[in-house]
Structure formats: structure tokens, C-alpha cells
Amino acid sequence: MAVSFELTEDQRELQGWVHQFAKDVVRPAAAEYDEREDFPWPVLQEAAKIGLYSLDFFATQWFDESGLGIPLTMEELFWGDAGIGLAIVGTTLAAASVTANGTEEQVGRWVPAMFGTVTEPTVAAFCSSEPDAGSDVGAMRTRAVYDEATDEWVLDGTKAWATNGGIADIHVVTAVVDPELRTRGQASFVVPPGTKGLSQGQKFKKHGIRASHTAEVVLDQVRVPGRCLLGGKDKLDARLAKAREGTRAGGNASMATFERTRPAVAAQAIGIARAAYEVALDYAKTREQFGKPIIENQGIAFMLADMATSIEASRLLVWRAAWMARQGKRFEKAEGSMSKLFAGETAVKVTERAMQILGGNGFTREYPVERMARDAKIYTIFEGTSEIQRLVIARSVSGAPIR
């Protein structure tokens, strides 16, 4: 079977289209919204106007046969700016959860509503992490109790680090329905707009990705109709019964979403790394010290060589994992985690080296690499820390119950 790494004409057009938007709209607004730590609604509206923020675009790229539509989009958008990029794509994590775990009726009802309209775009939030349950999803405390008399689920708890939390129209919340089963006793629920009892808690002031809204979501006796349980109650009851019998019945809803989205998140990190590398490369070619461009110094040139190599290697890991996921192939060696681990750590290393190459200029806000370095760090933390990725990979390659 022939192997080709050439992008199709359609893929190159997609790449160029998103890149142009990132160059013309995202980059000019990046420093302002980083400084303000505010959600970039005007940029989201521009994305909606051209169809970049829409259900049609999400569906087209999500179901792209090659699996590369989402990674290509992510890399170019986050090349523009990571904070604004997350503001634009944050809704897709909630949409991905409903698409992966919901019934056909639920997907048709809730996913379109997440994006709003061209003139009035809205956002959605996926709420999984908690103050005491980040990587350890088994420590989740948010509870969902079924009220049979009213056919409603009652949700109580606090979610942390929720992208778009509190400002979203629709929240997708993961909760424990059977505490004894730990991760296998969890389910996800859609909380519709205007539901009583849901409120925004603390809005976090962050080191990076400041244009992305990140906050706590407080759930106080939140009642949602039975139809808001993703997958439906019959499916949940069957899964819980198998879990109680000790029979494997698939992973929990949060982890299923994370596994499917890790290559996309890794592609975001590549966009940040590539942007910083390009700034450093251009700077090294024009900055002169001791009578010659600093790129002619081996110490600088070798740093750039390592940066370029790591970016290219990261992209290949991402493309492979994204293709495997789209083809329905199992991640036998935790390929999704490999892509997230390597790309996330590459972003941190590349942005730090870019700052070093720019010297004192790199440490100022007159140049964008200090912002890129702040943004990059989150990619070794969220959607599974680097340590968790290594744990997943180690378990996969060893077959041992490593802790």
C-alpha cells in the first residue's frame, strides 16, 4: 500500500484559509486580549461570519475521512494566538462529548445549539475537572441522582478549570451516578441554557491563554430532564450492570472525550511552537552581533535545528494519531497520548529557546515570544498532564499496572 504525506488540494486550501484568518484577524488582536484577560467576542463573531465558527465547519472537519481536518485547522489557528484560538475552539470539546456519547437525537438537538447563529454566536463548555479531581477522575465528587418521580437528574458539585464555564449557553457536565464504581460509575449530562442552580464561580487569572475564559462552574440542585443524560438511561443502566458484574463495558465518558481530542490539542501546541520558531528564525537572520547575523553562530543555529526537528516530529505523531482515530483503529501504544506528550513538551522547549535567541527582547512584551511561552506551558498540564500521558503510554507498552 502506498504511503503519501502530501496534503490534498482541499486540505491545502483549508490550511491557507485558516492561516489567512489567523494572520489578518487573530494576530492583530492577540496582545490586546492577552492584556485584558477578556473573551474576544468580536473575533468569534468574525470567525462565525466566514463560517470558521459554525456547526457545518465542525461537522465537516470532524468527519473528514483523513482525520487531518481538525489538526490542520488547530495548527494554523493557534499559530495566530493560543488564547484566542481556545476561545474559538473551546466549544468543540463539549460538541465532541455529545457527538461521541450522545444518541442521534441528542446530537441533532444540542450540537447545533452550541454554536448559536452567524449574527449571535454562542459558546458551550465541557465540565469535567474539579478542585480535587483533575488527572484523578476517580476522585470526582459531583453527583447526579435520578428522581424517578419527575424523570429528572439532580446535579450537585463544583467544576474547575472549565473553558467557557459560566458564560456558555450549554454546559456538558460529567458526574458520578454510582460512587462505588468510581470512574466506571460516571455519566455525562447536558445542562440547557437558563437552567436554575448553575452559576459561574471563580474566574481564574491565568499565566497564559488569557483570552480564553476559564472558570469554576457551581451546580446547586441543578435539575435536568432525563433526556439530557447522554446516551440515555437504558444504555447507562446496562453499562452500570456490567461494571457491577466486573465485566468491561468501555471507558468513562470524560476519558472517551479526551482520547478522541488529544491529537487535536497536540496540534494546537504545534501551532504555538511553529509561531515562536518562525519569530526566532527571522530574528536570528537579521540580528547582528560581532559583525555578523547571530544565525551564523553554531550555538544559535543548532538550537534552531533542534526546534525545527521537534516541530516536524510532533506533526507526524499528531497526523498519525488523528488518522488512526478517524479510521477507528485502536491506540495500541497510546499513540494519542504520545502525540499530546511530545507536542506539548516541544511547545514549551521551543518557546523557551525562542526567548533565549531573542535575548532581552524575548523577555519583553514588544515581541510575541514571551506570550507564546506563557501560552505553551498549559500544554503539559491540561487535557492530561505530561506525567499522565507517560503513565498511559507506559501501561500500554508494558502491559503492567503501573501507578
PLM regions with names:
Residues 142-145:
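A structural signal for short hydrophobic beta-strand segments in well-ordered beta-sheet cores
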Residues 3-4, 73, 93, 105, ...:
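Glycine-rich phosphate/cofactor-binding loops in nucleotide/flavin-utilizing enzymes
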Residues 49-121, 164-170, 325-328, 374:
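Internal helix-loop-helix
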Residues 79-82, 133, 160-166, 208-209, ...:
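Glycine-rich phosphate/pyrophosphate-binding beta-alpha loops
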Residues 3-14, 199-312, 379, 395-401:
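Glycine-rich beta->alpha junctions and the first turn(s) of the following alpha-helix
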Residues 120-129:
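A short, Trp-centered hydrophobic/proline-enriched beta-strand micro-motif
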Residues 27-35, 281, 285-292, 308-342, ...:
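C-terminal helix-coil-helix/basic helical segment that borders enzyme active sites and/or dimer interfaces
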Residues 152-202:
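A short core secondary-structure module
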